[in-house]
UniProtKB/Swiss-Prot annotation:
Gene3D superfamilies: 1.10.8.1080, Glucose-6-phosphate isomerase like protein, domain 1 (3.40.50.10490). This is N-acetylmuramic acid 6-phosphate etherase. Belongs to the GCKR-like family. MurNAc-6-P etherase subfamily. One of its GO terms (molecular function) is ether hydrolase activity. Homodimer. Residues 54-217 form the SIS domain. One of its GO terms (biological process) is amino sugar catabolic process. Its EC number is 4.2.1.126. Pathway: Amino-sugar metabolism; N-acetylmuramate degradation. The active site is at 82 (proton donor), 113. It comes from the Bacteria. Transmembrane segments: none annotated. It comes from Shouchella clausii (strain KSM-K16) (Alkalihalobacillus clausii).
Length: 296
């Protein structure tokens, strides 16, 4: 029953929320938010397992698919769309799907989360396969749509991961890796867009970022596959080249042009004193890893 879920119980520290001064409300929210990283820390071994599945999928040419309803679905879409500009991957490589379709991102779609079959249908629509990793999110851990996604993804041979914010979540039994972060009662009873949503976002940050490190999208702690799609990102790309090679801005800008805006190639060209074509060949031989390229 939903009333047994800790995410749905009342927070005893905020029973008088409607009469608390603004400052006290903010302190209470800040205090509760501070509990989230500690809760996540207990699940790091499970998160690590999930990351390894995602890396394996990427190495085989597979995809990472996030799926959820409401806030959970929106958070998956948010993380997915940020991967393209940050890591230079195709929008197909990391996808986010939400119960009720795209319109559900900006407005609630009545009954969408209760439709288990819709979760299965979305897996079919995306042609989920054995090379893919599917991560279903649900704060309650019992959302039918998310369970439908996991069941169908497993049936189609994909890696499956569940992220819930309650222990002994129903959806965990349908995932090969189950992440259960107990975030507890919300400041505003049942409003899982708060601590539960924060926990989900932090976990997705961990999974996508660490997986991208694992396939060579990062050098040192620099996002070397950034896509310079606007002037701000062009400048960031040049500064990444500067930092990675300890060169001047002028040198970085020069090699940025010589490399046709390819940040990785520019870095290798400077560090190994080679041509653009040679840099591309070396990177290809090292499967895109700059460190493996320059340390040979």
């Amino acid at each position: 029953m939903i009333d047994k879920l800790k995410t749905e119980t009342r927070n005893q520290a905020t029973m008088a929320l409607d009469s608390m001064p603004i400052h006290d409300i903010l302190k209470a929210m800040n205090r509760e938010d501070g509990k989230v990283p500690t809760a996540i820390a207990t699940q790091l071994p499970q998160i690590e397992k999930a990351v390894k599945l995602v890396i394996a999928s990427f190495q085989q040419g597979g995809r990472l698919i996030y799926a959820g309803a409401g806030t959970s679905g929106r958070l998956g879409v948010l993380d997915a769309v940020e991967c393209k500009p940050t890591f230079g991957v195709s929008p197909e490589m990391v996808r986010g799907v939400i119960a009720g379709g795209e319109q559900a991102f900006t407005e609630a779609v009545e009954g969408a989360e209760d439709d288990e079959r819709a979760g299965a249908n979305d897996c079919n629509r995306l042609n989920i396969g054995e090379k893919d990793t599917v991560i279903a999110l649900a704060a309650s851990g019992r959302t039918p749509y998310a369970i439908g996604v996991l069941k169908e993804a497993e049936a189609r041979g994909a890696n499956t991961v569940s992220i819930a914010c309650n222990k002994e979540a129903k959806m965990s039994q349908y995932a090969s890796v189950a992440i259960e972060v107990e975030t507890g009662p919300e400041v505003l009873t049942g409003s899982t867009r708060l601590k539960a949503g924060t926990a989900q976002k932090l976990i997705l940050n961990m999974i996508s970022t660490t997986a991208m490190v694992g396939i060579g999208k990062v050098y040192q702690n620099l996002m070397v596959d950034v896509q310079p799609t606007n002037q701000k990102l062009v400048e960031r790309a040049k500064r990444i080249i500067m930092e990675a090679t300890d060169s001047t801005y002028e040198t970085a800008a020069d090699y940025y042009q010589k490399a046709n805006g390819h940040v990785k190639a520019a870095i290798v060209m400077i560090l190994l004193d080679c041509s653009y074509d040679e840099a591309l060949t070396k990177l290809q031989n090292a499967k895109g890893f700059i460190r493996k390229t320059v340390d040979k």
